[in-house]
């Protein structure tokens, strides 16, 4: 079994360390409004970070900067000592919408953009997310949770070192959401990539992350380590206390108007839809 196959379908291996991230004085302005204000942040390789905050606080803007879908007004985005732009091939982004192409079968969506003999790898990626038997079906036959599993398989086939998650579970029912949280956490523990998850769900953040970052009016208002053993018991008093600490801070902040959505060049938009 080769290294790629082992990563997706065989004995768990941490084949690649995640990407270490450094943000230095990162800001983003839209007209007169500064959505992000001189963000300084260090994320060690392989850490699972959840980013929470009220609508309009700047958390999705931050993820777009990390994905290369937008550019900062000032500041630096680094992967280790190099520019983050140099790590684009090792970075994948998942959205709330699975963005599957309805005219392509499931396996073809997973292998989208790949060349050569990719079908075996695509099947292994589908096996890793529990959908090997749905490979030849159309996306229309899948539930919302299954579509997100396909989107996750599409990311896994590229062996990402940095996985960016922009509310990927927001449209799912509660039970499916928990199942997907457990799947993502399990794959992260197996492969060791760095994860940044943007979510409105504070309970989700403290359940899966090593660290919860609260964005308040474009600044880091809280940086909370979640030092609890895994797998975590969702009914535990410690988890509830951490959730309450974050929620109390979030609820103390006023709701902000949504920031404008920047339009990236078409090739970049297409790249992250794949």
Swiss-Prot record:
Does Membrane appear among the keywords?
yes
Q: Which CDD domains match?
A: ABC_NrtD_SsuB_transporters (cd03293)
Q: Name one GO cellular component term.
A: plasma membrane
Q: Which domain of life is it from?
A: Bacteria
Q: Show the Gene3D superfamilies listed in the entry.
A: P-loop containing nucleotide triphosphate hydrolases (3.40.50.300)
Q: Per UniProt, which keywords does this protein have? A: ATP-binding, Cell inner membrane, Cell membrane, Membrane, Nucleotide-binding, Translocase, Transport
One Pfam match, by short name? ABC_tran
Q: Where found in the cell?
A: Cell inner membrane
UniProt enzyme class? translocase
Could you tell me one molecular function GO term of this UniProt entry? ATP hydrolysis activity
Reported EC number(s) for this entry are 7.6.2.14
**What chemistry does it catalyse, as a reaction equation?**
ATP + H2O + aliphatic sulfonate-[sulfonate-binding protein]Side 1 = ADP + phosphate + aliphatic sulfonateSide 2 + [sulfonate-binding protein]Side 1
Q: How does it sit in the membrane?
A: Peripheral membrane protein
Instruction: Name all ABC transporter domain ranges.
Output: 21-242
Kindly list the positions annotated as binding ATP.
Answer: 53-60
**The protein's role, per its UniProt record:** Part of the ABC transporter complex SsuABC involved in aliphatic sulfonates import. Responsible for energy coupling to the transport system.
Membership in a protein family: Belongs to the ABC transporter superfamily. Aliphatic sulfonates importer (TC 3.A.1.17.2) family.
Q: How does it assemble?
A: The complex is composed of two ATP-binding proteins (SsuB), two transmembrane proteins (SsuC) and a solute-binding protein (SsuA).
Protein name per its UniProtKB record: Aliphatic sulfonates import ATP-binding protein SsuB 2
Q: Organism classification, top ranks?
A: Bacteria, Pseudomonadati, Pseudomonadota, Gammaproteobacteria, Pseudomonadales
């Amino acid at each position: 079994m080769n290294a790629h196959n082992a990563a997706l379908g065989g004995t768990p291996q941490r084949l690649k360390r995640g990407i270490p991230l450094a943000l230095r004085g990162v800001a983003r302005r839209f007209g007169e409004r500064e959505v992000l204000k001189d963000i300084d942040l260090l994320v060690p390789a392989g850490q699972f970070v959840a980013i929470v905050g009220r609508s309009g606080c700047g958390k999705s803007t931050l993820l777009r900067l990390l994905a290369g879908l937008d550019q900062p007004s000032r500041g630096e985005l680094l992967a280790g000592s190099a520019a983050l732009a140099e790590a684009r091939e090792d970075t994948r982004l998942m959205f709330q919408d699975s963005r599957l192409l309805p005219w392509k079968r499931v396996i073809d969506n997973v292998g989208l953009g790949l060349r050569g003999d990719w079908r075996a790898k695509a099947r292994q990626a589908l096996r890793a997310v529990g959908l090997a038997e749905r490979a030849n079906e159309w996306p229309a036959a899948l539930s919302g949770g299954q579509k997100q599993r396909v989107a996750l398989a599409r990311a896994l086939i590229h062996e990402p070192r940095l996985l960016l998650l922009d509310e990927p579970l927001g449209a799912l029912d509660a039970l499916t959401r928990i199942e997907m949280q457990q799947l993502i956490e399990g794959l992260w523990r197996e492969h060791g990539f760095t994860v940044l998850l943007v979510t409105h769900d504070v309970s989700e953040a403290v359940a899966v992350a090593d660290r919860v970052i609260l964005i308040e009016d474009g600044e880091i208002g809280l940086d909370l380590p979640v030092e609890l053993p895994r797998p975590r018991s969702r009914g535990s008093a410690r988890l509830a206390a951490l959730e309450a600490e974050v929620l109390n801070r979030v609820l103390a902040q006023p709701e902000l108007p949504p920031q404008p959505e920047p339009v990236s060049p078409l090739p970049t938009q297409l790249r992250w839809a794949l």
